[in-house]
Regions:
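N-terminal [4Fe-4S]-dependent radical SAM core
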Residues: 1-24, 73
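Conserved non-cysteine loop/helix-boundary elements of the Radical SAM core domain that shape
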Residues: 42-169
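Hydrophobic secondary-structure block in the mid-to-C-terminal portion of proteins
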Residues: 21-23, 30, 46-50
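Residues at the beta-strand->loop junction immediately N-terminal to the Walker
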Residues: 25-27, 83-84
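Structural motif
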Residues: 21-23, 35, 113
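Local cysteine-cluster metal-coordination motifs and their immediate loop/turn environment
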Residues: 27-42
Length: 169
């Protein structure tokens, strides 16, 4: 049943897109710690905090170059997904700046869904959530991986199941 429902919804969503519609992915390759199972390019913030400012400067240039191509081709951004890593490892000020750059460079008026991953409770704060909301983010993806403290410890996460619950309340 779930498989058929998912297939129908996927087909319905695909039918609503035009060939000029695109989805924008912004990758932030930083996390509080590196999980034992992770295969993504990412850096532990503890070990690479000094890399964040130059990374964001380079990302702003890449956003501008990408937006120029998107605009030249007459493409329309219909969704934005900021993933990682853990984008909420950025400070509220850095998130605000990044979202502002996206707004300045891209026409986001047709965006149907704007998602930011916030997979770690130790990276979620009221200030960051206010910034995201102010920029039109309408979906925050929180993926604790597990609610087992033992497994969290084994995979290299520094938080507990109780921390996850507190962050979401």
């Amino acid at each position: 049943q779930l498989c058929m429902t998912t297939a129908r919804e996927t087909l319905r969503a695909a039918a609503s897109l035009s060939p000029k519609d695109i989805c924008l992915y912004v990758g932030i390759p930083f996390c509080p710690t590196r999980c034992a199972y992770c295969s993504f390019v990412s850096q532990s913030v503890e070990k690479s905090m000094k890399l964040i400012p130059p990374f964001l400067e380079a990302l702003e240039k890449e956003i501008a170059a990408t937006a120029a191509q998107v605009n030249a081709l007459g493409l329309r951004v219909v969704s934005v997904y900021m993933g990682g890593g853990t984008p909420t490892t950025l400070s509220a000020e850095q998130l605000d700046r990044l979202c502002s750059v996206l707004e300045d460079e891209f026409d986001l008026s047709a965006v149907r869904e704007y998602t930011v991953e916030a997979g770690r409770p130790d990276t979620i704060s009221a200030a960051k959530l206010r910034v995201l909301r102010a920029h039109g983010v309408d979906r925050v993806s929180v993926n604790p991986q597990t609610m087992s403290d033992r497994v969290l410890e084994l995979i290299g996460r520094r938080h507990t199941a109780a921390d996850i619950e507190r962050a979401l309340m």
